[in-house]
């Protein structure tokens, strides 16, 4: 992957700036010693503290929302409002999702752990697994397509995929 390539290239790497999809990859770059501290008045002024590394190794330029997609034919507005509700037995056999090892789902699970603790997150994951309509497969677009095909009623995906699919 990218980290291995940058390590192999060393000082010969043509990369000056790395744009990547989530915080875990930024953290891996820092841990691998592939970043350097940046001091920028413009970035410091325009990027809030919560979206930048305290040591100045990275600045977040955008955020993405991971949302719950729902069939507008089979799920009433307001029936599900929070990720936590995905573990409710109400949704047994109704959820499609991509692999839990996907970076986006790992980030969501990390957020659940951060907000509720490891014990809660483990129970949430168990409940979510019990509610799957099928074995995790495909990408975010495949989950939305599965809702349209009637395979499931709910899925999780990044917001921008819907716009790309319209």
Q: Residue locations for each model-derived region?
A:
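Extracytoplasmic ligand-binding site segments that recognize negatively charged/polar headgroups
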Residues: 1-4, 14-151, 162
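Short beta-strand scaffold positions
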Residues: 20, 156-157
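Charged, often glycine-rich, active-site loop that binds/positions anionic groups
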Residues: 7-11
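A beta-strand-loop signature enriched in Asp, Gly, Thr, and Trp
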Residues: 158-166
């Amino acid at each position: 992957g990218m980290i291995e390539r940058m390590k192999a290239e060393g000082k010969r790497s043509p990369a000056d700036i790395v744009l990547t999809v989530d915080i875990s990859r930024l953290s891996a770059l820092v841990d691998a010693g592939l970043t350097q501290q940046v001091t920028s008045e413009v970035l410091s002024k325009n990027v809030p503290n919560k979206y930048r590394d305290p040591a100045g190794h990275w600045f977040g330029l955008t955020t993405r929302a991971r949302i719950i997609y729902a069939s507008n034919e089979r799920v009433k507005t307001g029936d599900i409002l929070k990720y936590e509700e995905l573990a409710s037995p109400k949704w047994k056999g109704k959820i499609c999702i991509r692999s839990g090892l996907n970076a986006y789902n790992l980030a969501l699970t990390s957020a659940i752990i951060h907000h509720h603790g490891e014990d809660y997150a483990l129970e949430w994951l168990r409940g979510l697994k019990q509610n799957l309509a099928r074995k995790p497969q495909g990408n975010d677009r495949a989950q939305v397509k599965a809702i349209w095909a009637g395979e499931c009623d709910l899925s999780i995906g990044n917001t921008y995929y819907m716009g790309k699919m319209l």
